[in-house]
Swiss-Prot record:
Its main location: cytoplasm. It comes from Aspergillus oryzae (strain ATCC 42149 / RIB 40). GO terms for biological process: formation of cytoplasmic translation initiation complex; translation reinitiation; translational termination. GO terms for molecular function: RNA binding; translation initiation factor activity. Residues 1-34, 159-184 are annotated as: Disordered. SUPFAM superfamilies: RNA-binding domain, RBD. The gene is tif35. RNA-binding component of the eukaryotic translation initiation factor 3 (eIF-3) complex, which is involved in protein synthesis of a specialized repertoire of mRNAs and, together with other initiation factors, stimulates binding of mRNA and methionyl-tRNAi to the 40S ribosome. The eIF-3 complex specifically targets and initiates translation of a subset of mRNAs involved in cell proliferation. This subunit can bind 18S rRNA. This is Eukaryotic translation initiation factor 3 subunit G. It is found in: Cytoplasm. Keywords: Cytoplasm, Initiation factor, Protein biosynthesis, RNA-binding. Gene3D superfamilies: 3.30.70.330. CDD domains: eIF3G, RRM_eIF3G_like.
Length: 287
């Protein structure tokens, strides 16, 4: 009887599966350094689901300034004495990490951001789109550097017809009484610019033609070939756009002989060139 009592029951070795129990998580290390994690869970329908995940561990090395690393290892003092290293959330608020990316065209980006923000830009930014325009030939250069400043008057400016009368009136208005003293700078002829050395007599034989309605595809060499049939051409100026480098629609042709210029003006006025009709006339002379 004692032998039967000490004998183990066969029912104790029987294992009963618990339907609510899940198998343990299995972690397997692969040869390529990754890990495969197998776990089980119940879905919304109460069914057992097997989940397999493959995890790859990446080590990121950060190079820190040695002085910065040394300061981080300092022991805290004062009210923070004895606390763990690093910022404490009850005394330190960590702001957003702003990534600084240097850019080559940072000036253009800053100007665009300023423009979008509605702020008034600098005077340089306001004038950067302005173009220089000559008052004589309407070209994109300063009037003082115009090659025709000595041979023609500004565009759309009337010639000096009553200039002498205006000078006489201005001079007479100062000293109306007989014998009254008139300062040198207010005397007749002093208000206008002085005569250039040999200016009027030197430029008498120079003839310049103004050619308008010129095609955008015109070239200075082509214009020179067209007008050199009537005489020697000393200078050809074709106004071009600074950005597109195309002709702006007008040009100036200077001849050595005025008779050749007159013949060219008569023959070339109304001449068809690149599907356009040229308008040729004598350029206005400066006074």
């Amino acid at each position: 009887m004692s032998k039967l009592a000490n004998r183990a029951d066969w029912a104790d070795d029987e294992e009963f599966d618990d339907p609510s129990a899940l198998p343990a998580q299995q972690v397997t290390t692969n040869k390529d350094g990754t890990k495969t994690v197998v776990s089980y869970r119940f879905n919304d329908e109460g069914k057992k689901v097997k989940v397999t995940r493959r995890i790859k561990t990446t080590v990121v090395r950060e190079h820190v300034n040695p002085q910065v690393a040394e300061r981080r290892s300092w022991a805290k003092f004062g009210l923070e004495k004895g606390h763990a290293p690093g910022p404490s959330f009850d005394t330190t608020s960590v702001g957003e990490n702003i990534a600084f990316r240097p850019s080559i065209n940072w000036k253009a980006q800053a100007a665009e951001a300023e423009k979008n923000g509605g702020e008034k830009g600098s005077m340089k930014d306001q004038l950067k789109d302005k173009k220089v325009k000559c008052r004589i030939c309407s070209g994109e250069h300063f009037t003082a550097r115009c090659p025709f400043k000595d041979t023609m008057a500004p565009v759309d400016e009337p010639t000096a017809g009553g200039a002498g009368e205006d000078d006489e009136a201005a001079a007479g208005a100062v000293g109306t009484g007989s014998g009254s003293y008139v300062p040198p700078h207010l005397r007749k002829g002093a208000a206008g610019g002085g005569e250039r050395m040999g200016g009027k007599f030197e430029k008498d034989d120079l003839a310049t033609l103004r050619v308008t309605n010129v095609s955008e595809l015109a070239e200075e060499g082509e214009l020179r070939d067209l007008f050199e049939r009537f005489g020697r051409v000393t200078r050809v100026f074709l106004a071009r756009d600074r950005e597109t480098q195309r002709a702006k629609g007008f040009a100036f042709i200077s001849f050595a002989d005025r008779s050749d210029a007159a013949r060219a003006c008569e023959k070339m006025d109304g001449f068809g060139y690149r599907h356009l009709i040229l308008r040729v006339e004598f350029a206005k002379r400066t006074t």
